[in-house]
């Protein structure tokens, strides 16, 4: 029996004092005791120690896989070595080269390199020693073309042309007017408002005064009191209006002039049966509920008038218009209704004129979403341009010599701006999609050759957003991005004749 017991112990670990089962049992009891002391539990559903061990093993395994992958990639595509990439950059200096045949040509910019190679590749970084082994050519490319491309073409396109009038500017002078182009949705907080209803801004351009409301401008004569009084304007408000830039003037569609409506054949006899008076007679019809209704007698019927237009006609004292004629509703209902006069320029109520001293910024806002047939055109007024206060430092001042207000002084790109655009007509209902343009973050615009070859080379394969020409043309224009223009060699480059000094802070 003793010999049999000694034989069983001999099959265990160490000196044969214990078996494998006894060792694993002891280890289990040790782990259970440790859990009882640390977690006050002995059921052993979860063993934190084993989880930690597995986590360490998994981390080490992942690190080994990553290292092996990096080693394999270094053999496939060694860093700093010449390969078949057509666009190459010096890893030390950043100089850009394009490979044509067996020769390297210094490229002026990334746009030129892509157009020459016909591929939207990014530069492959190479050591200077490797570049030195290749034959060289002269400088190639388009001077001034962009070097970065991150196309953005959101479905909703929004553009603004803004005038900001300095409160110290003299009447009629453009020196104190700053023109801003905004690409993106405006910020309408901080007392900024969209002009609607009777809201209006009165500005001057040249020798004329203009009432700006409902997305368009209408000329008004500062001496025509018959029109000014019903509109709630004074001759001083109109004659002393602040100036408007040519950029905003061109962007705003022109509406009918605000003057006394011209009635054809005023004073002559009306030809329809039951006419209450001669042509040009203003008639008023009392209503049981609501305001009185005004109408105007024309040659072949009567046209409904807004009360404000009826007052203008009364103030003018034209023929047949000395005093409103009262007509019963039953009589008016028998008269033919016509619509001969365009009265869309006149508001329903007196104007609520924006004080330009408190709201010196006036913006024309064009907005259109993909799939819509018409653009929305509105006017925004506020104390500053519609840019969030935290974004004001991102407004880019442009370098230009023009002081006539025909070009932008500064530009801002919102978070949802479009930089690859197609020009469309200025009319809100325009359906055309014309030339293609690339807009840089510095505010310059570059024409893009409308060919699949050029667009593929530049990486501009997405559908361009629409942009109105009246806003886009205010940005400084760069050269056209085409392959023919890129395939040009240079010894030297022309000098910019209108530069601006860079002020370096001390």
UniProtKB/Swiss-Prot annotation:
It is found in: Cell inner membrane. GO terms for molecular function: ATP binding; hydrolase activity. Its main location: membrane. Coiled coil: none annotated. One of its GO terms (cellular component) is plasma membrane. InterPro entries: T7SS_EccB (IPR007795), T7SS_EccB_R1 (IPR044857), T7SS_EccB_R3 (IPR042485). Residues 77-506 are periplasmic. Residues 1-55 are cytoplasmic. It is a single-pass membrane protein. Its EC number is 3.6.-.-. Keywords: ATP-binding, Cell inner membrane, Cell membrane, Disulfide bond, Hydrolase, Membrane, Nucleotide-binding, Transmembrane, Transmembrane helix, Transport. The chain crosses the membrane at residues 56-76. Disulfide bonds join 162-363. Belongs to the EccB family. Part of the eccB5-eccC5 operon, which is essential for in vitro growth. An ATPase (shown for residues 80-506). Part of the ESX-5 specialized secretion system, which is responsible for the secretion of EsxN and a number of PE_PGRS and PPE proteins, including PPE41. Part of the ESX-5 / type VII secretion system (T7SS), which is composed of cytosolic and membrane components. The ESX-5 membrane complex is composed of EccB5, EccC5, EccD5 and EccE5. This is ESX-5 secretion system ATPase EccB5. It comes from Mycobacterium tuberculosis (strain ATCC 25618 / H37Rv).
């Amino acid at each position: 029996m003793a010999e049999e017991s000694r034989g069983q112990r001999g099959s265990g670990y160490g000196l044969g004092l214990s078996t494998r089962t006894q060792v694993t049992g002891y280890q289990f009891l040790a782990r259970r005791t440790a859990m009882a002391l640390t977690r006050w539990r002995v059921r052993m559903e979860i063993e934190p120690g084993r989880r930690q061990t597995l986590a360490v093993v998994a981390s080490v395994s992942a690190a080994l896989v990553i290292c092996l992958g990096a080693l394999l990639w270094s053999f496939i595509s060694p860093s700093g070595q010449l390969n078949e990439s057509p666009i190459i950059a010096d890893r030390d200096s950043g100089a850009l080269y394009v490979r044509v045949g067996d020769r390297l040509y210094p490229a002026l910019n990334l746009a030129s390199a892509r157009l020459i190679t016909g591929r939207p590749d990014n530069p492959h970084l190479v050591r200077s020693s490797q570049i030195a082994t290749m034959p060289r050519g002269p400088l190639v490319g388009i001077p001034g073309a962009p070097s970065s491309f991150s196309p953005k073409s959101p479905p909703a396109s929004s553009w603004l042309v803004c005038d900001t009038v300095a409160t110290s500017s003299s009447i009629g002078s453009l020196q104190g007017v700053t023109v801003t182009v905004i690409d993106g949705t405006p910020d309408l907080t901080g007392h900024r408002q969209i002009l609607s209803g009777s809201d209006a801004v009165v500005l001057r351009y040249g020798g004329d005064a203009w009432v700006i409301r409902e997305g368009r401008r209408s000329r008004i004569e500062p001496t025509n009191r018959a029109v000014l009084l019903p509109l709630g304007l004074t001759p001083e408000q109109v004659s002393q209006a602040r100036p408007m830039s040519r950029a905003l003037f061109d962007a705003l569609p022109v509406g009918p002039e605000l003057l006394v409506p011209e009635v054809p054949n005023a004073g002559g006899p009306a030809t329809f049966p039951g006419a209450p008076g001669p042509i040009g007679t203003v008639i008023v019809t009392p209503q049981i509920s609501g305001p009185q209704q005004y109408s105007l007698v024309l040659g072949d019927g009567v046209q409904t008038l807004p009360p404000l237009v009826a007052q203008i006609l009364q103030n003018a004292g034209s023929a047949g218009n000395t005093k409103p004629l009262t007509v019963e509703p039953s009589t008016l209902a028998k008269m033919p209704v016509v619509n001969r006069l365009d009265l869309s320029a006149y508001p329903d109520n007196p104007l609520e004129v924006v004080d330009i001293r408190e709201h010196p910024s006036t913006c024309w806002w064009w907005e259109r979403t993909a799939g819509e047939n018409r653009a929305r055109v509105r006017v925004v007024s506020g104390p500053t341009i519609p840019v969030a206060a935290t974004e004001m430092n991102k407004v880019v001042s442009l370098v230009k010599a023009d002081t006539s207000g025909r070009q932008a002084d500064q530009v801002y790109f919102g978070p949802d701006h479009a930089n690859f655009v197609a020009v469309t007509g200025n009319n809100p209902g325009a359906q055309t999609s014309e030339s293609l343009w690339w807009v840089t973050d510095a505010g310059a615009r570059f024409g893009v050759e409308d060919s699949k070859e050029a667009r593929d080379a530049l990486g501009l394969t997405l559908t361009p957003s629409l942009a109105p020409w009246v806003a886009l043309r205010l940005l400084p224009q760069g050269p056209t991005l085409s392959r023919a223009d890129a395939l040009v060699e240079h010894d030297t480059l022309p000098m910019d004749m209108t530069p601006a000094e860079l002020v370096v802070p001390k």
